[in-house]
Every structure is written in structure tokens, then in C-alpha cells.
């Protein structure tokens, strides 16, 4: 089986990790020099390198695998996980100096689970530290924010994002044209991990294939939707999105709409109005009884605006 490009090109040291802010690089280097980490809360969009940075730090500190507990909180997010799995790990002595709990997607932990986590962090802070990652820091309770050093990871700008993806294609000997690559960028930005996966999955005989219209079995239905939008097949694209999108993806779909204003009109007035339509749809999404109907209505408004 081919090696996953996301793993092949994952940074493993501070020197290979791409920091958007030199001050953050210095801060991270300072933690490594001290030989221990504080409680940390990494926030940022999906695929921007939060978990990668956490693993870079643990690698730089040469923490024994036995002293690391990694949990994906989108799957294990209740009080029982905190009370049993995490407490059992935190309460025993480390093999080295300090144990570390890496909690991915901590914003998915239930409020009761977060309250229980606060107590564990306080009780075992001398021998166990916590690294939390989240996409939506506002979903993390203030008590956890106050116990962690916040660290927001900015997304790459779209030019750097595209260049990074193109460089990987060059390194892998993949033939690609810019229009095709741009389709993948539009479907996945700012999630670099997702974009790399999509590109690798759609390489045939060392050529990056263009997504086919209406292919619901595509590795990512959003690629097909973009092709439909570009071809003026708004109804088909709307049907595909509403049938394939999971509720937790709706925020990302609204952000996709905003990033690609050119799909909703060529004039400045049309694009300004599209921003208002998207804003209204996103604001209503969490309030209405059926968010799918709200999403569909927003797409219809955008289609009418583009005429």
C-alpha cells in the first residue's frame, strides 16, 4: 500500500513545522528548552496543524510513548471517559518526568465532561499536563481556558496553501494543471490535511484527475458540487450538498460559500449581496428546527442572486 502523503509530509520537528508567527515559534522553542509543557489549548480551523504541533512538541521533548494518552474527543467525550480513562492514566506515576494527555477536538466534550476534566487537571498538574485542540474555542468552558495557555494557529493564506499542495505533487512526480488543482483547493481550503488526502486519492497513473460532475461516490462530494456550480447546475449542486452533508459540516459549507463569492455573481453588487445572504443563513442555522431546509433555502437565494 502506498504511504499516506499526510504522514509522509507531516512535520516532526520545530524546524520543519511552518509557523505563521515567528513569535509563536520562539514561544514553542522556549517550552522545549524548559523541558516541560504547561497545559495548552491549541485552536484553529481543521487541518491547520494543531495535532501535528502537539506531536512535534512531544517528539522534541522525547516523551516516552507510555507517558502519552491520546484521545479523540469527538468519539470519547462524556463524563465516564474523563472519570475512568483519563483519571486512571493521570493518577499513576510517569515513567519519565511528566505524563501528557492529548485531547483532540476537545470542543466536542460535553459540558459535564469539561467540568470533570477541570478537576482532573487541577488534581494531577504536578505529574500530568494536558494538550487540548479545538476548532471552536468558544465551545470550551471558561474554566478550561483559564487553566491553559491559549495558542491560536492561523490558517495558511490560499496562495501558500496552493503552493504547498503543488510542491507535494511535484515531489511525488504527479502531473497537474492549475485549474484542476484549484478545484481541490476550493473544496478543502483551509484544511490542508483534507486537500492532500483528496489529491492523493484522485491521482491515476501519476496524473491528477478532474472530479466528474454528479459523482456521489467521489472521495469528496464537494468537489462534484463545485464542478456543478461552475457549469451552472445549481439545483443539482444543491441537491448533492443537502443529501451528503452531515449537520456538523454545515458551518464549513457556509464558509465555503463565503470563500467562493465568484460562484454567486460577477459584479461587486452581487457578491456583496451574497455575503448578506450567507450571513443570514449561517445565523439562522443553529436556531431553526431543520438546518437542512435552511441550508437549501440559502443556496436557492444565492442562485437567484447570481442571475
Q: What are these regions, as identified by a protein language model?
A:
Residues 1-151, 160, 166, 183, ...:
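P-loop/Walker A NTP-binding region and its immediately flanking N-terminal helices
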Residues 34, 92, 190, 230-231:
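Charged, alpha-helical scaffolding/interaction elements associated with membrane systems
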Residues 101, 181-187, 193-205, 242, ...:
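C-terminal helical "lid" of AAA+/P-loop NTPase domains
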Residues 142, 159, 178, 215-223, ...:
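Amphipathic alpha-helical repeat elements characteristic of tetratricopeptide repeat
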Residues 157-162, 175:
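C-terminal lobe/lid and adjacent interdomain/linker elements of RecA-like ASCE P-loop ATPase modules
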Residues 170, 174, 179-193, 212-215, ...:
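A short helix-loop-helix "switch/interaction" segment in the helical subdomain of ASCE P-loop NTPases
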Residues 181, 199-226, 271-275:
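Conserved C-terminal helix/linker of AAA+ ATPases
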Residues 226-307:
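Helix-rich C-terminal "collar"/helical-bundle subdomain used as an assembly and partner-interaction module
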Amino acid at each position: 500500500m502506498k504511504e499516506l502523503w499526510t504522514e509522509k509530509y507531516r512535520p516532526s520537528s520545530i524546524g520543519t513545522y511552518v509557523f505563521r508567527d515567528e513569535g509563536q515559534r520562539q514561544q514553542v522553542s522556549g517550552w522545549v528548552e524548559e523541558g516541560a509543557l504547561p497545559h495548552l489549548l491549541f485552536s484553529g480551523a481543521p487541518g491547520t496543524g494543531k495535532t501535528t504541533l502537539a506531536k512535534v512538541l512531544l517528539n522534541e521533548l522525547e516523551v516516552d510513548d507510555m507517558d502519552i494518552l491520546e484521545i479523540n474527543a469527538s468519539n470519547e467525550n462524556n463524563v465516564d471517559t474523563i472519570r475512568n480513562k483519563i483519571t486512571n492514566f493521570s493518577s499513576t506515576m510517569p515513567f519519565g518526568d511528566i505524563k501528557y494527555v492529548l485531547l483532540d477536538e476537545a470542543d466536542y466534550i460535553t459540558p459535564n465532561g469539561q467540568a470533570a476534566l477541570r478537576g482532573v487537571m487541577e488534581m494531577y498538574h504536578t505529574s500530568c499536563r494536558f494538550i487540548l485542540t479545538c476548532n471552536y474555542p468558544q465551545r470550551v468552558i471558561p474554566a478550561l481556558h483559564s487553566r491553559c495557555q491559549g495558542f491560536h494557529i492561523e490558517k495558511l493564506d490560499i496562495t501558500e496553501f496552493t503552493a504547498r499542495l503543488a510542491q507535494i505533487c511535484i515531489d511525488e512526480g504527479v502531473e497537474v494543471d492549475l485549474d484542476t488543482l484549484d478545484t481541490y483547493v476550493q473544496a478543502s481550503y483551509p484544511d490542508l490535511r483534507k486537500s492532500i488526502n483528496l489529491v492523493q486519492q484522485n491521482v491515476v497513473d501519476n496524473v491528477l484527475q478532474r472530479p466528474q460532475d454528479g459523482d456521489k461516490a467521489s472521495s469528496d462530494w464537494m468537489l462534484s458540487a463545485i464542478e456543478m456550480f461552475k457549469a451552472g447546475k445549481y439545483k443539482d449542486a444543491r441537491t448533492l450538498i443537502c443529501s451528503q452533508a452531515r449537520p456538523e459540516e454545515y458551518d464549513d459549507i457556509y464558509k465555503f460559500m463565503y470563500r467562493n463569492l465568484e460562484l454567486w455573481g460577477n459584479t461587486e453588487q452581487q457578491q456583496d449581496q451574497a455575503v448578506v445572504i450567507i450571513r443570514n443563513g449561517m445565523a439562522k442555522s443553529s436556531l431553526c428546527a431543520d438546518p437542512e431546509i435552511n441550508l437549501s433555502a440559502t443556496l436557492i437565494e444565492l442562485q437567484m442572486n447570481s442571475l
